[in-house]
């Protein structure tokens, strides 16, 4: 992962990691920020929209644009492989898939990606060797577009890629043709390994069933990009077979502290019905919910709207980075470093899953010239935080810098080369603007003015 400018160093709240321009007695300046409860659109999180019934064959640019305009920054990209159960993926298919990712990027969006051989419910999928071959073919396209694929469901197996009802021996139990669980487990492990080998390390691979994750990773320690997707979140006592025991629920609550967890709701799948506002406001943070389908189940989502909690769910889902305070020396001498200490926290339900740095920019009030440095990794911030973490950015003031007053700007752009210069992919902090304090948001540059000034001599 490449970060913007400077060197990368995260500091604890008690540590100092800067060479000050006058360590003896340099006067300092600081400012505090005010949080907001506003629902702020941000990449890699939140309710996800629609991109068409098939991402390759029936892509709907208009649906993606509607999703963006509504404040969503993710769309579901469903890709049918039904025509290739017994064949390699043709070059034309791979080329069109690459073009679809480019179209999503142009729209300022990212995807939660799903490949499946069956979207009818029949479970007509492919053999583990065929799935592995297809993933090997997909690897270059996925790597080239990793910037817009933060999440990918494990997919491929069974009905709707949900890892049940397989006709190829990839599941056992209900609608699985009598396949033994020992055989199914071998097949599932082959597919798991193929996913881990061919999906970019920056993409969270969301597996359907906690029982698989418990089998593979008993202590909840796992590769950094293994996540979970619950296709019947809040459906009832078992979430339609998602959880076979209380221990599975406890495991997932622990597991999701460190990895991505998302899903979609279901229509009255079980009794007692368990999808009210108190349910989502309790289990959303318990399971560290990062993303959720905005189109299904509408009855559940409408219930939240009517009961008044939909906006809270929308704003709290995923990460939510809130600035608390900034402090730095009031003045710096050219040829030295200035340390800008930023206290911030993640008050969202989940962690950030793609690394990105905090960026500090000094902008000359007279000329508009800038100098920039970055530090830290916002994905390391714990979710639902009650206290601040300090990141200190050390910025070198070159001898060529013009003397004068410089505004301090804060930002968190995307870390990928293709999207890091695009403000639509930058994080907007969960802070209210305070124009009278000089704290304003610049949507063009995706920067927040800290309201402090550094004087350079």
Give the positions of each predicted feature:
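Bacterial N-terminal signal peptides
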Residues: 2-15
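Catalytic cores of secreted or luminal carbohydrate-active enzymes
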Residues: 276-328
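Catalytic-core regions of glycoside hydrolase
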Residues: 151-158, 162, 166-297
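An active-site-proximal structural segment forming one wall of the substrate-binding cleft
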Residues: 93-106, 126-153, 184-198
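Aromatic-lined substrate-binding rim segments of carbohydrate-active enzymes
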Residues: 61-118, 128-131, 203
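Bacterial Sec-dependent N-terminal signal peptides
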Residues: 12-32
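Boundary/entry segment of secreted carbohydrate-active catalytic domains
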Residues: 28-73, 78-80
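Extracellular/luminal regions of secreted and cell-surface proteins that mediate adhesion/ECM remodeling
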Residues: 314-457
């Amino acid at each position: 992962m490449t970060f913007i400018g400077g060197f990368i160093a995260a500091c604890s709240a008690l540590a100092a990691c800067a060479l000050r321009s006058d360590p003896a007695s340099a006067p300092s300046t600081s400012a505090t920020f005010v949080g907001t409860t506003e629902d702020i659109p941000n990449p890699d999180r939140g309710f996800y929209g629609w991109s068409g019934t098939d991402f390759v064959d029936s892509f709907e640019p208009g649906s993606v644009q509607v999703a963006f305009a509504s404040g969503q920054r993710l769309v579901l990209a469903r890709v049918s492989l039904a025509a290739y159960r017994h064949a390699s993926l043709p070059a034309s298919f791979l080329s069109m898939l690459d073009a679809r990712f480019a179209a999503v990027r142009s729209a300022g969006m990212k995807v939660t990606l799903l490949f499946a051989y069956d979207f009818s419910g029949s479970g007509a999928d492919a053999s583990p060797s065929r799935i592995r071959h297809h993933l090997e073919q997909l690897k270059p396209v996925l790597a080239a577009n990793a910037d817009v694929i933060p999440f990918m469901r494990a997919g491929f197996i069974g009905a709707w890629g949900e890892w049940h009802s397989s006709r190829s021996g990839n599941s056992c139990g209900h609608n699985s043709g009598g396949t033994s669980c020992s055989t199914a487990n071998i097949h599932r492990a082959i597919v798991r390994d193929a996913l881990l080998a061919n999906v970019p390390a920056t993409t969270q691979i969301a597996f359907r069933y906690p029982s698989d994750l418990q089998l593979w990773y008993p202590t909840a320690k796992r590769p950094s990009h293994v996540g979970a997707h619950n296709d019947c979140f809040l459906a009832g006592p078992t979430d339609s077979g998602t959880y076979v025991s209380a221990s599975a629920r406890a495991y997932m609550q622990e597991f999701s502290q460190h990895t991505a967890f998302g899903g979609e709701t279901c229509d009255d799948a079980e009794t007692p019905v368990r999808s009210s506002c108190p349910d989502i406001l309790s289990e959303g943070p318990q399971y560290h919910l990062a993303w959720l389908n905005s189109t299904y189940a509408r009855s559940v989502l409408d219930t939240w709207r009517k009961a008044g909690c939909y906006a809270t769910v929308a704003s709290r889902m995923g990460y939510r980075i809130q600035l608390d305070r900034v402090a730095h020396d009031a003045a710096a001498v050219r040829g030295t470093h200035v340390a800008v200490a930023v206290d911030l926290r993640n008050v969202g339900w989940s962690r950030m899953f793609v690394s990105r740095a905090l960026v500090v920019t000094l902008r000359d009030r007279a000329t508009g010239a800038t100098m920039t440095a970055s530090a830290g990794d916002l994905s390391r911030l714990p979710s639902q935080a009650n206290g601040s973490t300090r990141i200190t950015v050390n910025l070198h003031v070159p001898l060529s810098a013009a003397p004068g007053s410089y505004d301090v700007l804060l930002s968190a752009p995307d870390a990928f080369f293709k999207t890091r210069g695009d403000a639509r992919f930058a994080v907007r902090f969960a802070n209210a603007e305070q124009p009278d304090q000089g704290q304003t948001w610049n949507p063009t540059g995706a920067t927040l003015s800290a309201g402090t000034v550094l004087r350079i001599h």
